[in-house]
Amino acid sequence: MEERYLQLLAREYPNRQAALCEIANLTAMSSLPKGTEYFFSDLHGEYKGFSELMNGASGVIREKIRIQFQDVLTNPQQNQLANLIYDPVKVLSLMHEYGRDTNEWLKNTIFYLTQLCRGVSAKYSRVHVRSKIPHEYDYLMEELLYPGQDEGRLEYGSSIIEAVVSSGLADTFIPQFCKLIRSLTMDWIHIIGDIFDRGPRPDRIMEELIEYGDVDIQWGNHDISWMGAACGNRVLIANVVRMGISYNNFDCLEDGYGINLRPLSDFASEVYHDDLCECFLPKVLDENVYDKVAKSLSAKMHKAMAVIQLKLIGQMVHRHPEYHMEDRNLLEHIDYEKGLYKYNGITCPLTDTNFPTVDPKNPLELTQKEAQLMDVLAASFAHSEALQRHVRFLYSSGSMYLCMNGNLLFHGCIPMNEDGSFERVEVDGEKYAGRALLDRLERAAREAYFLPKDHPDKQKNVDKMWLLWCSAQSPLFGKSRMSAFERYFTKEKALHEEVYNSYYRLSADPHVCDQILKEFGVDPVHGHIINGHVPVRQKDGENPVKADGNLYVIDGGLSKAYQAKTGIAGYTLIFNSHYLALAQHHDYISHPLSKPESDEMPTLQITQKMDKRILVSDTDAGKKLSQRMDELRLLVKAYENGSIVERAIGSYPKTIQSLHMETMEIVR
């Protein structure tokens, strides 16, 4: 096997010199500082807010400007440069509006951008920087970034800037330079769950993540709901449509994903024509741009989907008694004559008793029109090219959890018992706990999407996606129940209560964090748990850093729906070669950029300084580089002892540089 592998490697590095050259390249790469990782959580469709955080690298760009130019630029000038990098088109427009975009200002701006870009690119190889430079300006930008020390070369750089401005290229050159700085500032992005629901455009967030590329995702329960809908789970199709309507997210459903809601609109208008559906009025946090729907009609559509979903949930509960979720089968616990809900010793009146499509003798049966409506919706989800492409990206870049560079990332919880032991959860007749549970559930989620339609295990795994969405034993949910439907139809507070899994209390204990980190093979001395799911009530004094610094909970309320609870507009955790830091964000969307020097920067707090600067060799990528170098050394020995014959580099079409870039993609 080793000889066969070396023969394959020899196709890429056809002689001893080529292999040694790559070993030298990778050795140099290993000695560079690690790139900066950014951790975001619970984006919930807030595309504009997320874009602001991405464009500003969560305040890191502003801090780099302060360090590099504090003796050169005034504070307003530093703000102006930062805002230009965040939103170059907007700032250039404002400068033009104020008559301040003189040639001198443009030349100075390009000069400062060049200086800053040299600073942020210093930790990367030229190959990496070159791969990020926009193609149309690759020659000009590379010449500016690597001028050399010769006086003539310095004058050459000035002449390039002069030529860019005098030829009228500045308005396109500057935005591309800003984009390069932004991309070099953020080496890797972690999304710790819940891209979808509540906010207006999760589809646009997905497009931005796909374009960025260097990203991983730890699935949240709201993500798994959309993934399940894309798999054909009808409970979850009803769920995402219901939730989308409840938050007035018609633009996402219809414009973003092309979901045909006209049959639902017609059905709801007919069935609930004389019902005000007051319990189902949508929460309007954002107005629709492309698909404006009257609140009265939205409420009817909302109720129609809620009732259909309740029927489908009841059917799911009957199909899978092993889920132990009988408390979700609400429609079979209603006394329709008296208008009462009865379950588990609790009897309470319903706030809404108009169920024109429910047969009290067979409450879980869909009417013919409801069944036809679900057929239309299922077809829309199955044939939505954008949705299916986004879900494939969620699968290819996502997982239930991730261990990377000494950190353990997951969205919700590791189910635990009160005594601190890992909860044993039954899946297909076998019990799993801890890491094994998450591995088993991830396998089920992948099989739900990728197994052929006629595979005998396909449907049971598709059904499990609902379990992952809202089961008390789901690591993505981690509450006793999801009481959304009790909130629709009852005022009984006891029925509204959702009790968190013991993990959420126990994980504040450093010893419990150590136990969890060890379970996942992460060093508890230097490792951290990073998760979201539960909004941190910062306004009430809650700290996102828990368990003596072992646990970071970074759901700070980027979602507008939670900002009243948290008091802020989200957190970003930043992990660079020097420290861990938390950026605390303000509501940038309510305070749009009005002048170039506006100061709407996040609060940056360093939470942990590293004992020594972290190098690439200290990271997971560094371990892969080391492994690659070991393989190349074996290849060199094979060339030296003659077991593999050397060839000229010209025998192969690929250059050493292109092979080096491929190697870097492998280790990333």
Language-model segment annotations:
Residues 1-668:
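Feature recognizes metal-dependent phosphohydrolase scaffolds
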